[in-house]
Amino acid sequence: MKIKKAIIPAAGLGTRFLPATKAMPKEMLPILDKPTIQYIVEEAVAAGIEDIIIVTGKHKRAIEDHFDNQKELEMILEEKGKSDLLQSVKYSSNLANMFYVRQKEQKGLGHAIWTARQFIGNEPFAVLLGDDIVQADTPAIKQLMNQYETTGKSIIGVQQVNEIETHRYGIVDPEESYNELFSVNKFVEKPEIGTAPSNLAIMGRYVLKPDIFDYLERQEIGRGGEIQLTDAIEHLNSEDCVYAYNFEGERYDVGEKIGFVKTTIQFALKDDYMKKEITEFIKSINK
């Protein structure tokens, strides 16, 4: 079955970016001239996703407004002859069929995914988390979709990380592999330093069969007092093989401040308009 739907969880409090996120959704913080969540939506659209449901929470209305039509703004831009800006505004309003559901309680990623179950129905679906922007010739989520079409099994996107970073991620304990596709012995959510079974970290891209909702509904509270998606995937894997796929692409961590700043600089250095001036500025402060 073709994958046409995607879930983007965006209900988190964004505490790492306080006080900036006290009144503004973390997902609306910009990398250059686009909010981070737009990069995620664009990846889904480039992969052929048609319907996107964003799981939001309190004080997240700005996300809905961003992907909605802004007729008054469009009229002003048209009257002033600012055609480039007009096109960019219209573009963000027409990326995909956008839907929204609110996660009323902060019960974790697994609960956020479960909240969107009525939208998904009995179809396989994609999940894209907003903490990582991935640039690749083939969109990261599309790579996973291709693997799903081949195997018919749930696929978890992974990439290698340094051993000292494994405690920050869900980690897979891989078994057999074929062309970067791994069967998995177990999934470990944020292992203690020095205890990780590998350096293959789960990187916020998933293609899941709808069976996962049954496991999420029964899932007990896990690490951090939350319903963990990784725990539900572990139970699914015990009854129906779940694969990990080491996808290609350059990953940018925008889920914490240092990574966010690095990403902004890296994107600026790739921008034709900004590259020269930013390069000269960096040289000037390093003298």
Curated annotation (Swiss-Prot):
Q: Name one GO biological process term.
A: enterobacterial common antigen biosynthetic process
Top class in the EC scheme: transferase
Q: What is the lineage of its organism?
A: Bacteria, Bacillati, Bacillota, Bacilli, Bacillales
- Report the function annotation for this chain: Catalyzes the formation of UDP-glucose from glucose-1-phosphate and UTP. This is an intermediate step in the biosynthesis of diglucosyl-diacylglycerol (Glc2-DAG), i.e. a glycolipid found in the membrane, which is also used as a membrane anchor for lipoteichoic acid (LTA).
User: Per the UniProt record, which EC number(s) apply here?
Assistant: 2.7.7.9
Q: Which UniProt keywords apply?
A: Carbohydrate metabolism, Nucleotidyltransferase, Transferase
What organism is the protein native to? Answer: Staphylococcus saprophyticus subsp. saprophyticus (strain ATCC 15305 / DSM 20229 / NCIMB 8711 / NCTC 7292 / S-41)
CDD domains from the UniProt entry: UGPase_prokaryotic
Per its UniProt record, what Pfam families does this chain match?
NTP_transferase (PF00483)
Presence of keyword Transferase: yes
**Per the record, what are the reactions this protein catalyses?**
alpha-D-glucose 1-phosphate + UTP + H(+) = UDP-alpha-D-glucose + diphosphate
The protein's matches in SUPFAM superfamilies, at most eight in alphabetical order, are given as:
Nucleotide-diphospho-sugar transferases
What's this protein's family per the entry?
A: Belongs to the UDPGP type 2 family.
Instruction: Report the protein name in the record.
Output: UTP--glucose-1-phosphate uridylyltransferase 1
**InterPro entries linked:** GalU_uridylyltTrfase_bac/arc, NTP_transferase_dom, Nucleotide-diphossugar_trans
Q: Which GO terms describe its molecular function?
A: UTP:glucose-1-phosphate uridylyltransferase activity
Pathway(s): Glycolipid metabolism; diglucosyl-diacylglycerol biosynthesis
User: Is the keyword Transferase assigned to this protein?
Assistant: yes
